[in-house]
A protein has these predicted regions:
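Beta-propeller blade signature
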Residues: 1-4
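Extracellular glycan-recognition regions
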Residues: 6-198
Length: 198
């Protein structure tokens, strides 16, 4: 901002507001700036504004951008050369307790979340998946268990199955694509890629 006669001039030279304004700021790369948190933590956290793509097989610790619900058990998860292993808990996302759940805060109105999931060992009582969670009463989940993937919309604490498909492989990629107030839930395996719900 430039000051003229004790008044701020936001767009000098144009004399009016425009749709865009060019601001001359030096480029900042937090991964190389010794004063930045990203640099000081040894790239434990993602660079601000960067794509959030994680390869858990190469991680020693979770970055600070990962969140947990309430007070999780210390041994709730493990990072190994095979990836991120969450230990099963009877607590669900609908309870005001500490489920086996690791999250990243949604930062944009348009985004896509994907997770590769091993399905062996999953049953109707031992389910795993991904979710967009607003609270214990409002969430969109895609869960795999008992050779089936279910898309569950929870509103006011009531679950409604809005899509499902048979799971044939021992490994699937689950996805939730958000576009403003709409969501598309998908699943892919070695043979197919399908939309489970929109």
């Amino acid at each position: 901002v430039v000051w003229e006669n004790d008044w701020p001039v936001v767009n000098p030279g144009a004399g009016m507001l425009t749709d865009t304004v060019e601001i001359e700021l030096p480029e900042w790369r937090p991964e190389t700036d010794v004063n930045s948190y990203t640099y000081r933590t040894g790239a434990k956290t993602c660079v601000p504004g960067s794509s959030r793509e994680y390869d858990f097989t190469n991680m020693k610790v979770l970055g600070d951008e990962f969140l947990f619900l309430r007070n999780p058990e210390e041994n709730m998860y493990q990072l190994t050369e095979k990836g991120l292993n969450l230990h099963f808990s009877p607590v669900t996302l609908k309870e005001k307790a500490s489920p086996s759940y690791i999250a990243i805060r949604q930062q944009h109105h348009r985004c896509k979340v994907e997770a590769c999931l091993k399905t062996d060992g999953l049953t109707s009582a031992r389910r795993a998946g991904i979710a967009v969670v607003q609270s214990d009463e409002y969430q969109l989940r895609v869960e795999v268990g008992d050779s089936k993937a279910d898309v569950i919309l929870c509103e006011k604490g009531m679950d409604q199955c809005v899509g499902s498909a048979v799971v044939e492989d021992k490994e699937v990629v689950l996805s939730i694509a958000i576009d403003e107030l709409k969501a598309t839930v998908g699943m892919k395996d070695s043979k197919r890629e399908i939309i489970l719900a929109e």
